[in-house]
């Protein structure tokens, strides 16, 4: 491993401006960042992650003015979402402008855009815009892990997974654990009403309340995190409802992720016992990675109850169990 671990956002911005890669902290998960207008740099994201070329990337920008530069059409309801949830863990999908090249859109006519809430990520973006004298500069940054695997919520997770594929010009900006722990909500804004493409901390109810509109139905737009099997550790994931936990036959030595208050069945290894849904989201990926570090063959996961963020956590568990 010959990359540089750094603590100053300006160093990350400089590496990005020079078309190198940067592992970056956001409020959701750590991202593998590249200058979004550089085919060479973005191409390295796909190579490093072994990511399919038709799988679109999210362009991280500084503010809603930049969004208007990257999108060819921004409907009124999208402005309501920007005002309510940006900066923050929500990605919006628009018809793309000429700024958005095929290599970040997966060949689609749409582009996914987010204004991140992480102060450090915003500092990187601000510095990048200054270095390039372009206020609309963007960072393409999918999760900093191999495609289909568990997203990293610490810099160490990212370094363990892709560190051997980074060069001495690439950098890792370590800012500690991510606050939210699961990826952003993705909202399709290419039609006459919003449609949820990926669940996250911003809930369907939040979107409907902010826009005053009912959500639309299915969408043909491709977005990150929509594959049936995703977010998967090497261990097999067994989703078990709370009522079934005492009756479920489970392999001896399996790991357990379950809300606090639920006992650990005999012979199993407790990996996480979050007290709230927010704690569950923040700790889920760390616990799945711990299962792999302990070389467990199976992880039994009891999802959180409720709706909203709990639905997003259940979505990640369900996709992990499909692998």
Report the location of each language-model feature.
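Active-site-adjacent structural elements in enzyme catalytic cores
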Residues: 1-323
